[in-house]
């Protein structure tokens, strides 16, 4: 069984930094959901948004706890992935844009968590957190995509959901490429 790296080592600091980025993304996602609560007022959406918000807060807690259990200290992340995506995307024009932004960010989170879980040498405690958050992300994607398509259909423009999602994806790919390049450079400098 893989053990946690020793505090003070480069490997330890890198893991804590990555987990701090995950935590920040979950908190940023929770803030976005609070905005959505004001726009989606029907009872079904309110129920799903509240569950989704609870999941995001729990995910942030799981990453906080994992870092603490390792003996680490949270990194203050001020320029994380979701922050960058939000700056680049700008203010969503309507609920469909808000849902598309959420869908694309959730999709990236799921991909990132699944990729991390497949890496060699991931310890069991971190795998446990990765599995827990990945399971929730699948439900988040399903309900957000369904709601976005429902709203587009109700507005008489079913393709609007696809256009909004593709617009966000194009922006997200640019943001992600920059983020990954900077992360690789940080990891290179740390070794």
Regions found by a protein language model. Name each.
Residues 1-191:
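Non-heme di-metal
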């Amino acid at each position: 069984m893989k053990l946690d790296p020793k505090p003070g080592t480069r490997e330890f600091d890198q893991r804590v930094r990555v987990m701090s980025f995950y935590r920040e993304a979950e908190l940023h996602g929770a803030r976005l959901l609070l905005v959505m609560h004001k726009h989606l007022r029907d009872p079904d959406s309110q129920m799903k948004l509240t569950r989704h918000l609870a999941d995001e807060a729990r995910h942030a807690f799981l990453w906080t706890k994992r870092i603490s259990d390792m003996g680490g200290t949270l990194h203050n992340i001020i320029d994380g992935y979701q922050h960058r995506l939000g700056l680049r995307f700008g203010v969503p024009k309507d609920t469909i844009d808000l849902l598309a932004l959420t869908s694309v960010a959730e999709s990236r989170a799921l991909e990132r968590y699944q990729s991390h879980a497949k890496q060699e040498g991931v310890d069991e405690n971190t795998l446990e957190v990765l599995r827990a958050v990945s399971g929730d992300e699948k439900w988040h994607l399903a309900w957000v995509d369904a709601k976005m398509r429902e709203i587009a259909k109700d507005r008489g423009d079913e393709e609007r959901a696809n256009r909004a999602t593709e617009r966000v994806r194009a922006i997200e790919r640019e943001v992600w490429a920059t983020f990954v390049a900077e992360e690789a450079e940080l990891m290179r400098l740390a070794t």
